[in-house]
Amino acid sequence: MSIVDTTIKDHPYQLVLVYASKGCAYQELVADLKKLLLSNITIIVTGDFNFHSKERNALTYFLVAKKMLRQLVNWPTHDEGRTIDHCYVSKNARVQITRYSPYYSDHDGLCIEFEHFPW
């Protein structure tokens, strides 16, 4: 499991990149995210979660029910037909998400663009 957290001073958004290996302990990931995620800021949590986006677990419960984020990816992102690359954003975030399929990967790439910059 890996997490990269990026916040830029004086800009009200936080980008968190996640790689969750297969079978990772979601409770540990939730504990790490609880420490990282800020309040009163636009949040984007995205990455390779290695479970189908429709699966319910401690991580999806925390991001959707507790942090009130919405999952934007609703198409298969892996060659096996599952949606394992997710993008959770704050409800107030006005973003556009598109996919692209690099030839060198078994995952689709996600391109996240702000429709309206929050600063």
Task: Show where each model-derived region lies.
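A shared catalytic/ligand-binding motif for oxyanion handling
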Residues: 1-119
